[in-house]
Each structure stands twice: as structure tokens, then as C-alpha cells.
């Protein structure tokens, strides 16, 4: 299935699940959508936190298309599920933004680690959340983001359990893709990140960690949602964690070496 066909299936309501493992050679994007009055500070926030918030594209005020991501793409309808935040609280999850769209909304598309999973799989590195049919586990850490204006919050990480040799290979592979979070930020000791229980992720689903495996943590594009909650904007919208925007950007084009 091409990215365009995948987006069409989302748009007509045929697909509503997590997007990991779909359209493998193509990049997926996290979303943050907020009023134009706050967009400059949020842009500075992304620039100050590039590991968690690598920008793939930024829309014009009111625009629900970013041509660089896909010609037939509609931000309002092409994500399986959206989180709506009001005054810093998650108030609802919706399957379309058509009724909520505002002329001053600015869209930020942020790189997603699902994008490099195809590269890991090609190297024979198993991905437990894909194997188990679950959403990737994501955890809010005790690490504060670099603040920019009203935006702060805490770093969120995704976790994939890997054997030592696979973890080393994963570092080598993912370091080539800083536009989709790059290399892991930590391996092996979740308490050093302020994570007490790997079986209780704040976002996504817990996965099986087998004997001899290490938890490998990548900076995650859900991080901006902690910043949106911290800022307590009157309204802000993001993808539901694990439910991404499929783009026409090839993963190979994002490699820096």
C-alpha cells in the first residue's frame, strides 16, 4: 500500500489503529497543531529540543496541507486519531478535525521513530510491539525539556527491548537518521530517566521484555504534548500517541550518511 492509499484508508475510516509497521519505506510524522499566536515560541521550542522534536515541516496559518509531506494530504482527516487539549487537559479524542479547524491553526510535523523501524527490521532486528500487535511503549521521564517561552514540559521516550548486539547495531543504524530522533538517548537503566515501572507506560502499551534483553530508549515525538499541556493553551491538538501521519517522504532520503 502506498502512503497515499494508506491516508485514503484513514480518511474514509477504514483504518484507526497504531501506524507502526505500515508503509515501511516511508516516514511517519507526529503532529502538533496550535494557534498562530503561540507558533513562534513553539518553533523555538522545537529548535531548542531537536532530539525529541525534529521538524519535518511547518504549515502556514490556517493551512491543513504541507506539500512537502504529500500532495494529496489533509492534516484534518489523515491521522487515525487526534488528541484535543484545552487549558492543558486532554478533553477528547477525535477521528477528524474538520469540525474543530480554525483559520489560525499552525501545523508542526515532527519526525517519528516508526520511520527507522523499517531499517531495523531489514537488518533482522525484531520489534516487540510489532510482533505483539501493540502500540510502542512511551514513558514520561524526569528530564526537563529546554524551555522556550511558555513551552517546557518533560522529555518523553519510546522503548524497544533488544539484545546487546542488536542494541549496538540499532545505535549504528538510527544515528544516520537525526530527522526521526536518531540514536537512542539511553540503554539499560530506566530509573536513571525517572522511569520506575516499564510495565506501566504513560502512553502506548507495555511489551514483553525477555531475559537477556535491554530496554533501549529513544527521544519521542510525544514530547511536544507534554509541552502543550504545560503551556495550558486554550486549545491545542496532536496525534494520539502511536497514531501517526503517513508521509510521502522516503526514509532513505532522511539519512545523513
From Swiss-Prot:
UniProt-listed SUPFAM superfamilies: PSTPO5379-like
One GO molecular-function annotation for this sequence? lyase activity
Q: Which Pfam families match?
A: D-Glu_cyclase
Q: What class of enzyme is it?
A: lyase
Listed A to Z, the keywords are: Lyase
NCBIfam families assigned:
PRK05463.1 (NF003969)
Please state what the protein is called: Putative hydro-lyase BceJ2315_40370
Q: Tell me the organism.
A: Burkholderia cenocepacia (strain ATCC BAA-245 / DSM 16553 / LMG 16656 / NCTC 13227 / J2315 / CF5610) (Burkholderia cepacia (strain J2315))
Amino acid at each position: 500500500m502506498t502512503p497515499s492509499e494508506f491516508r485514503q484508508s484513514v480518511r474514509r475510516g477504514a483504518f484507526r489503529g497504531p501506524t507502526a509497521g505500515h508503509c515501511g519505506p516511508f516516514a511517519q510524522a507526529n503532529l502538533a497543531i496550535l494557534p498562530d499566536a503561540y507558533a513562534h515560541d513553539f518553533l523555538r521550542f522545537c529548535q531548542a529540543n531537536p532530539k525529541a522534536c525534529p521538524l519535518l515541516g511547518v504549515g502556514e496559518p490556517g493551512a491543513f496541507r504541507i506539500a512537502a509531506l504529500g500532495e494529496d494530504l489533509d492534516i484534518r482527516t489523515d491521522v487515525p486519531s487526534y488528541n484535543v487539549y484545552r487549558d492543558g487537559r486532554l478533553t477528547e479524542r477525535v477521528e477528524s478535525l474538520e469540525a474543530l479547524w480554525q483559520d489560525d491553526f499552525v501545523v508542526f510535523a515532527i519526525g517519528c521513530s516508526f520511520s527507522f523501524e523499517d531499517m531495523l527490521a531489514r537488518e533482522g532486528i525484531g520489534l516487540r510491539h510489532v510482533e505483539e500487535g501493540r502500540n510502542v511503549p512511551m514513558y514520561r521521564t524526569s528530564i526537563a525539556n529546554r524551555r522556550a517561552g511558555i513551552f517546557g514540559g518533560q522529555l518523553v521516550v519510546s522503548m524497544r527491548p533488544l539484545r546487546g548486539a542488536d542494541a549496538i547495531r540499532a545505535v549504528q543504524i538510527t544515528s544516520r537518521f537525526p530527522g526521526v530522533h536518531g540514536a537512542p538517548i539511553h540503554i539499560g537503566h530506566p530509573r536513571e530517566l525517572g522511569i520506575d515501572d516499564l510495565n506501566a507506560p504513560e502512553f502506548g502499551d507495555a511489551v514483553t521484555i525477555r531475559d537477556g534483553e535491554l530496554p533501549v530508549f529513544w527521544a519521542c515525538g510525544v514530547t511536544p504534548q507534554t509541552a502543550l499541556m504545560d503551556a495550558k493553551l486554550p486549545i491545542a491538538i496532536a496525534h494520539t500517541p502511536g497514531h501517526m501521519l503517513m508521509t510521502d517522504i522516503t526514509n532513505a532520503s532522511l539519512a545523513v550518511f
